[in-house]
């Protein structure tokens, strides 16, 4: 499993920081649409405040969106999921799988792997999905 570092405890709309098993890549899930909370989460992984504004502007009507940027040390990924959107549990999980695949693709791009094996891809997707599913459940339990 990826390493977890708590960003904010006791706040369901903030995320743990997950690190990829290879490379210098980390990712979080944000399910809140409140600007201050999104900006605070992004600040935890060293995103410049002006970029947080760009992320929010790009949100539009998307159910979910994956944002990727680099700083001197990390490839950083924020997955935003609109927790107020309609849909059953299977539909919501399917969207999370879609976003997880973007993370897996970025992991392999980051380490220069152009043709990862099927089993390796499946393993990474399983791990990222698991992390995002657990995080999504923690952030949205009781809704």
Regions found by a protein language model. Name each.
Residues 44-90, 103:
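Active-site scaffold of zinc-dependent metalloenzymes
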Residues 107-114:
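Short helix/strand-bridging catalytic loops that position acidic/His residues to coordinate divalent metals
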Residues 1-13, 127-134:
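N-terminal amphipathic/basic-hydrophobic helices that include classical n-h-c signal peptides
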Residues 6, 26-30, 65-69, 74-82, ...:
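Ordered hydrophobic segments in well-structured contexts
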Residues 88, 92, 114-117:
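Short alpha-helix boundary/capping segments
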Residues 8-47:
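Charge-rich, low-complexity N-terminal segments
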Residues 115-143:
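Post-HExxH zinc-binding segment in Zn-dependent metallohydrolases
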Residues 94-106:
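Active-site recognition of the HExxH zinc-binding catalytic motif
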């Amino acid at each position: 499993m990826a390493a977890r570092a708590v960003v904010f405890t006791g706040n369901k709309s903030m995320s743990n920081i997950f690190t990829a098993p290879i490379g210098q890549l980390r990712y979080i899930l944000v399910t809140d649409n409140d600007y201050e909370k999104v900006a605070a989460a992004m600040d935890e992984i060293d995103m410049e405040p002006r970029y947080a504004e760009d992320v929010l502007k790009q949100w539009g009507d998307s159910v979910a969106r994956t944002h990727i940027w680099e700083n001197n040390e990390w490839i950083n990924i924020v997955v935003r999921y609109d927790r107020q959107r309609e849909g059953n549990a299977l539909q919501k999980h399917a969207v999370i799988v879609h976003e997880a695949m973007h993370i897996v693709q970025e992991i392999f791009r980051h380490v220069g792997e152009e043709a990862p094996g099927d089993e390796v891809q499946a393993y990474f997707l399983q791990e990222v999905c698991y992390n995002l599913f657990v995080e999504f459940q923690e952030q949205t339990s009781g809704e």
